[in-house]
Amino acid sequence: MLLLIDNYDSFTYNLYQYFCELGAEVVVKRNDELQLTDIERLAPQHLVISPGPCTPNEAGISVAAIRHFAGKLPILGVCLGHQALGQAFGAEVVRARAVMHGKTSAIRHLGVGVFRGLSDPLTVTRYHSLVLKADTLPDCFEVTAWSERDGVRDEIMGIRHRALALEGVQFHPESVLSEQGHQLLDNFLNR
């Protein structure tokens, strides 16, 4: 079973639908309706932290769940969930250089983890005004995807823990305008 923590976002059920289409059994719980002990009782095999309209500080159980379950089960953070993953390990969340609400971007990636077998560059849909500050990302993470500005690396679009099954993507793979979203999510399920 995959537990999807809903950070009160309209895209949560798009993620739910994509994971169900990939054959996953998915349980959705709001970020303020469960405690860590509730998650333990549910005994998920995967944990996904959804997008949301706030910062990780207002994302209910999200950061605490990442800290508690890191190394115990695979975790994927999407948009706000990606930011929560970084913040849980000490990275700072800051304002993005440009607000990206409903805009597509061609991003670059390393072809590892959730990006395994995906096109590079990859067109993705972005809905965010915050990002992880690159120089605060701890060494235990590698940047696996990034946007570019004038041919130079710009903002972090994907991270992966070097030792634990933890990954984050700043964009929305579940958006209809994102390329290969199903494959990215399938890569998470079948690591």
Curated annotation (Swiss-Prot):
Question: Could you say which EC number(s) this protein's record lists?
Answer: 2.6.1.85
**Tree of life domain:** Bacteria
In the record, what terms sit under GO molecular function?
Answer: 4-amino-4-deoxychorismate synthase activity; anthranilate synthase activity
- Keyword Transferase carried by entry: yes
Cellular compartments per GO CC = cytosol
Q: Show where the Glutamine amidotransferase type-1 domain sits.
A: 1-191
Supply the enzyme class, top level. transferase
Q: Which UniProt keywords apply?
A: Folate biosynthesis, Glutamine amidotransferase, Transferase
Q: Which Pfam families match?
A: GATase
In its UniProt record, which GO terms are filed under biological process? folic acid biosynthetic process; L-tryptophan biosynthetic process; tetrahydrofolate biosynthetic process
Q: Kindly tell me the pathway this chain contributes to.
A: Cofactor biosynthesis; tetrahydrofolate biosynthesis; 4-aminobenzoate from chorismate: step 1/2
Q: Where is the active site?
A: C79, H172, E174
Asked if Transferase is a keyword of the record, the answer is yes
Q: Which reaction does it catalyse?
A: chorismate + L-glutamine = 4-amino-4-deoxychorismate + L-glutamate
Described function: Part of a heterodimeric complex that catalyzes the two-step biosynthesis of 4-amino-4-deoxychorismate (ADC), a precursor of p-aminobenzoate (PABA) and tetrahydrofolate. In the first step, a glutamine amidotransferase (PabA) generates ammonia as a substrate that, along with chorismate, is used in the second step, catalyzed by aminodeoxychorismate synthase (PabB) to produce ADC. PabA converts glutamine into glutamate only in the presence of stoichiometric amounts of PabB.
Subunit-level organization: Monomer. Heterodimer consisting of two non-identical subunits: a glutamine amidotransferase subunit (PabA) and a aminodeoxychorismate synthase subunit (PabB).
Question: Matching NCBIfam families, A to Z?
Answer: PRK06774.1, PRK08007.1, PRK08857.1, trpG_papA
Which protein, by its recorded name, is this? Aminodeoxychorismate synthase component 2
Organism listed in the record: Serratia marcescens
